[in-house]
Regions:
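SF2 helicase catalytic motif II
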Residues: 238-275
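Conserved helicase motor "Helicase C" RecA-like lobe of SF1/SF2 P-loop NTPases
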Residues: 443-467
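Inter-lobe coupling linker of SF2 helicases/translocases
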Residues: 224-225, 229, 235-239, 298-406, ...
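Conserved interdomain hinge at the start of the Helicase C-terminal
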Residues: 362-380, 417-441
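Conserved helix-turn-beta segment of the N-terminal RecA-like "Helicase ATP-binding" lobe
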Residues: 186-210
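Conserved RecA-like ASCE P-loop NTPase motor core of nucleic-acid helicases/translocases
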Residues: 177-184, 195, 355, 438-445
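Charged, low-complexity
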Residues: 2-148, 202, 217-222, 227-228, ...
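Conserved SF1/SF2 helicase motif Ia
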Residues: 145-149, 153-156, 161-192, 270
Length: 470
């Protein structure tokens, strides 16, 4: 296993920022547990204590006694943000933040994408205003040892914002630390190309194929790993002092009991950032899973979140509970849509983005066999015949690249896993549909449109086929 980065010191995290204790005072002197019990058990409104009559409300005191005497950092911050804490009986007790807790509460409330981060040195891109606000929001959270969910719509540039974040932190931290990006296989190559394009001086390491070594890891390096490899390398990855761990397409960790979620939770870091266009697809528990990874403890345990938030909101539609949840999560989740007033004016009319995907094993085998056979025939021909054979070969290779089933005319054959291009298309379209986007897919071949329609149907994506047979 690789050693931790030399000189690496963790930043201050949520657990050490705040240590909440509460006390009940009488003439400025704290009451002990025996005196508090006496006040809570009082049958009348007056209690003889310390040589004097003390007026009390037994019900209020009983509720106070149900509140834990000490709250850890996440629970205390949640109480400060929401303005209340829930006791063991489910009743709420008002909380008024003061001192540093109030300062932190106000500061977090100001993080919601208001400040713009200057483009860092080494970034070969011009960030749009909303992207600079996103970088500033992530950087402020990371500097405080916190984490968050960047939930921008697909196409708003979450990747370049993370690259800029890495550069900002590398130049603002007393000691630089590497960044780990965990992502689906289909976008691993895209991450590498985007980093090379927008931050050419940043060293990049892909933990794929046979070369998965972490030896000689640089403090300013970005490491890319798929979710599958991350699961297998979790112990080694946990040995590194990561500055930031980023989970791209973070819906992959929405099930806290799944192996992938357990593995990524075992990798410590100064800060964690989740990237997703759909923070909640079906249930509020998905939001809990994301924020419990980025900011552990903020929303309590899974059972606490279910009883205090999910059930009241999803089953009973309690507005006050929904508002309280919004207060808790707002500083830690930045959600921007393409139609937002602060985003739409900054967007170009169209952005062209190429996604390069690998061929499947079947496609590679068919490519090799077809090229070998065709070249033998082409070399033995000449003139117009030779030209025609070259064009037929190119057409066949295009069909194989689309899907082997198209070339073999297997209209009803299996689809999944046979074509890198089809699998990537389904993933991109699925992400867009989950973000309530509309998608137009073109193909030169009617037969390929039929295969796409079948594959979308398997994924539950409704579509209209506008292909007209020639």
């Amino acid at each position: 296993a690789p050693p931790p980065v030399a000189g690496k010191e963790p930043m201050v995290g949520l657990g050490t920022l705040l240590d909440f204790r509460w006390e009940v005072l009488c003439d400025g002197v704290p009451l002990d547990d025996i005196e508090l019990d006496a006040l809570a058990d009082a049958k009348r409104g007056l209690v003889w204590m310390r040589g004097r009559w003390v007026r009390t409300d037994a019900e209020v005191m009983r509720r106070i006694r149900q509140v834990p005497s000490g709250l850890d950092g996440p629970s205390g911050l949640a109480a400060a943000l929401a303005g209340e804490v829930v006791d063991d009986d489910g009743a709420t007790v008002e909380v008024v933040a003061a001192g540093f807790a109030d300062t932190l509460r106000l500061r977090l409330g100001e993080l919601a994408g208001l400040r713009e981060e200057a483009e860092p040195e080494g970034l070969a891109a011009t960030l749009r205003p909303y992207q600079r606000r996103g970088v500033a929001w992530m950087a402020d959270l990371c500097r405080a040892g916190l984490g968050g969910v960047l939930a921008d719509d697909m196409g708003l540039g979450k990747t370049v914002q993370v690259i800029a974040l890495h550069l900002v932190l590398a130049r603002s931290r007393p000691i630089a630390a590497p960044t780990l990006v965990v992502c689906p296989t289909s976008v691993l190559g895209n991450w590498a190309r985007e980093i090379a394009r927008f931050a050419p001086d940043v060293p990049v390491r892909k933990l794929s194929g046979p070369d998965r070594s972490l030896a000689g890891l640089a403090s300013d390096e970005i490491v890319l790993v798929t979710y599958g490899v991350m699961r297998r390398m979790a112990d080694d990855l946990a040995e590194v002092g990561w500055g930031v761990v980023v989970a791209d397409e973070a819906q992959s960790i929405k099930n806290p009991r799944a192996r992938t979620s357990r593995a990524i939770r075992s990798i410590p870091a100064d800060a964690r950032i989740a990237l997703t266009g759909t923070p909640v697809e079906n249930r509020l528990s998905e939001l809990w899973a994301l924020l419990d990874w980025t900011t552990p403890g903020l929303l309590g345990s899974a059972e606490h979140f279910r009883t205090q938030f999910a059930v009241p909101i999803e089953r009973r539609g309690v507005r006050t509970t929904s508002q309280r949840l919004s207060l808790l999560t707002k500083p830690f989740m930045l959600r921007r849509r393409k139609t937002d007033d602060g985003v739409a004016p900054d967007l170009p009319s169209r952005t062209q983005h190429d996604v390069v995907v690998p061929l499947s094993v079947e496609q590679l085998s068919m490519y090799e066999a077809l090229v070998r056979e065709s070249l033998f025939q082409i070399n033995g021909s000449e003139g117009a015949t030779r030209v025609g054979m070259v064009f037929r070969l190119l057409t066949a290779l295009k069909q194989i690249a689309n899907h082997p089933g198209q070339y073999l005319h297997e209209i009803d054959g299996p689809l999944d896993g046979r074509s890198g291009k089809l699998d990537a298309t389904v993933e991109l379209v699925g992400a867009a549909v989950e973000g309530e986007e509309r998608v137009l897919v073109f193909s030169q071949y009617v037969e390929m449109c039929h295969l796409l329609r079948r594959r979308f149907a398997e994924e539950g994506v409704s579509c209209s086929d506008l292909a007209v047979p020639a």
